[in-house]
């Protein structure tokens, strides 16, 4: 049975995540306050950040940057796209 959370990102009730997706207190906060749809939106945004900025998830500085962007994206709603980013054209 799925759980329902009030998603901070969507500002509405949403289906909750099935597991804690991130370590530590931030992971617990995400589990309690973020829905599946919002988490999928973050994963897509994170992929774009990694690709456009040529980040390595193994680099501690890059991980710190991604964690800061995660918080801005999900909880502050003010994450920016990389400079010069052009969204792909879909057919």
Swiss-Prot record:
- The answer to whether keyword Iron applies is yes
Q: Answer whether the UniProt record assigns the keyword Iron to this protein.
A: yes
Question: Keyword set for this entry?
Answer: Iron
The alphabetized list of GO BP terms reads:
cellular response to oxidative stress
Please name the InterPro entries in this protein's record.
Fe_traffick_prot_YggX, Fe_traffick_prot_YggX_sf
Q: Name one GO cellular component term.
A: cytosol
Task of the protein: Could be a mediator in iron transactions between iron acquisition and iron-requiring processes, such as synthesis and/or repair of Fe-S clusters in biosynthetic enzymes.
| Protein name stated in the entry | Probable Fe(2+)-trafficking protein
Q: Which organism is it from?
A: Xanthomonas euvesicatoria pv. vesicatoria (strain 85-10) (Xanthomonas campestris pv. vesicatoria)
């Amino acid at each position: 049975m799925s759980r329902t959370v009030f998603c901070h990102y969507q500002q509405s009730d949403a289906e909750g995540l099935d597991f804690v997706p991130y370590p530590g207190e931030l992971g617990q906060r995400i589990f309690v306050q973020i829905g599946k749809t919002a988490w999928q939106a973050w994963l897509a945004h994170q992929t774009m950040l990694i690709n456009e900025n040529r980040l390595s998830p193994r680099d501690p500085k890059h991980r710190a940057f991604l964690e800061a962007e995660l918080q801005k994206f999900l909880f502050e709603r003010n994450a920016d796209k990389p400079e010069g980013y052009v969204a792909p054209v879909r057919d």
